[in-house]
């Protein structure tokens, strides 16, 4: 057994129980406090895993915000929440940090039920400005709300929702602070000089003079530096020769500011708080992974990490027992793309997370990363399909929710053959309820023209990719869970499946279990438990929720006293469609006992996937108990045909 990593010495942080304690610290002490918070973040995440790089990048900004503003009366809204660990440490949750992302522990994101310092929960991007503006207008209408501050990253601000909020905030012209945390752009020396000059001026003059001050500084510089400063300012503002983009939207723009310069941050935030009347955007440039060399040198690899050695940065990864679903998808799609030049892939800022980075390395001109823009991703894919391409739109289940109108209106209504790759289906573990893939089956299966599949294992996933490649009759979707497969034998190449055709994987006579998706192995385990009690069980894999294999369902009903459907999704999904079919086809007329097993009607909090499914009542033991109870109430109808359920 290894000894735990020694915790860092943090004399200043030890004195801070809540942000109010920071008011007594000098600016120099606040700078040292930031160093201690950074050490604490590294120590914590080394033990728990989590989002490291983003949190390290905002340490100074977090300290400065809590030192200047009066949270929780002032509402500090973090976008996404990946970067919230320093915030949690400073707001009374330090002693709980080593429970981060664990069962019964702290969330990895901001969460209203966790702390008064988390006024708005986050885990999906680009929501912060809208929420902060809502708080600001609540204040204007008499609610006990102080200042409102939204902290949003340069990735999140690419999403349309952020610009909708900026546009509305500019129109309302109420006091609101937006901090643009830009961690993808370094500051060259001329830009640093410009930023410092603007910081000094902002502490002495109204913000309205900042543009004139910037122009004056540029004019005073030698030729090459003057041109460089002008280009740099235009680069970060995007509106050469006129107002900045943010100013055109009605904001006062300040920046860029070095987000690791505590003095500059404190001066800027204090001046903003003292003088602002309308909305102001402060552009802060930070470095992802700041202060920890492994994370600075590989920000993509240290965005989200497993437990790691804080000295070397080496992450602790368990040995895989079976292929990873996402990698199976990425590799298989790449092989199919080598055979079919019409195949393209689309991702919304998640090339590695969705596996399309594998194809991107081989066919870079056929993989499109559209940024955090799921709505655009879906309709862009629809356009590609309309042009004759075979687009695979790869988006996590929980993020696909953001593009639902586009799926319905731009894809399904026009019957365009977009292939939806739905990763992270079902419960996902440490990221908890915000990232659970619970609702996609329900909201997609209800759409006309849609074909919907769910992979029972990694081999089935390969077959479904091949099916999607061959399917040009309309939109088609397939879903699969996070993590490892179940260790089945893998085919060399996928077989095209017949749409709406399931398979029987085990034959029995008493009760039938019809599984949709990756809970098939739990259904098979349940069958073994029942078999040991003398109950004969048929287990079938539906493969499709739309179209349903009604022939298979009919045969299961005719030959069994009870039928149990099992799925890794919410109510209103596969089982609901089976029940609807049976109700309209007379399947219940003879006394069939049907039980529909889904995720419960609540959000399931973070834990290991095994614990989450136990909480949901979807273990093999739960399936067996449900089947046992159904069998006790069902009765066998006279057979209307003699054929047994077909096996594949």
From Swiss-Prot:
Domain of life: Bacteria
GO biological process, one term: thiamine biosynthetic process
Annotated pathway: Metabolic intermediate biosynthesis; 1-deoxy-D-xylulose 5-phosphate biosynthesis; 1-deoxy-D-xylulose 5-phosphate from D-glyceraldehyde 3-phosphate and pyruvate: step 1/1
Residues binding Mg(2+): 154, 183
Cofactor note: Binds 1 Mg(2+) ion per subunit.
UniProt keyword terms in alphabetical order: Isoprene biosynthesis, Magnesium, Metal-binding, Thiamine biosynthesis, Thiamine pyrophosphate, Transferase
Cofactor(s) it depends on: Mg(2+); thiamine diphosphate
Molecular function (Gene Ontology), one example: magnesium ion binding
Catalytic reactions on record: D-glyceraldehyde 3-phosphate + pyruvate + H(+) = 1-deoxy-D-xylulose 5-phosphate + CO2
Keyword Protein biosynthesis: no
Enzyme class: transferase
Purpose of the protein: Catalyzes the acyloin condensation reaction between C atoms 2 and 3 of pyruvate and glyceraldehyde 3-phosphate to yield 1-deoxy-D-xylulose-5-phosphate (DXP).
Name of this protein: 1-deoxy-D-xylulose-5-phosphate synthase 1
Record organism: Cereibacter sphaeroides (strain ATCC 17023 / DSM 158 / JCM 6121 / CCUG 31486 / LMG 2827 / NBRC 12203 / NCIMB 8253 / ATH 2.4.1.)
